[in-house]
Amino acid sequence: AIGFDGLNDPDIVAR
């Protein structure tokens, strides 16, 4: 899943 900063999903954290 795609989670920006872990908001949606803690899989991919993009800051």
UniProtKB/Swiss-Prot annotation:
Localization per Swiss-Prot or TrEMBL: Secreted, Cell wall
Listed GO biological process terms: chitin catabolic process; defense response; polysaccharide catabolic process
Key words of the record: Carbohydrate metabolism, Cell wall, Chitin degradation, Glycosidase, Hydrolase, Plant defense, Polysaccharide degradation, Secreted
Catalysed reactions, as listed in the record: Random endo-hydrolysis of N-acetyl-beta-D-glucosaminide (1->4)-beta-linkages in chitin and chitodextrins
MF (Gene Ontology): endochitinase activity
Function: Defense against chitin-containing fungal pathogens.
The name this protein goes by in its record: Endochitinase 1
Organism: Taxus baccata (English yew)
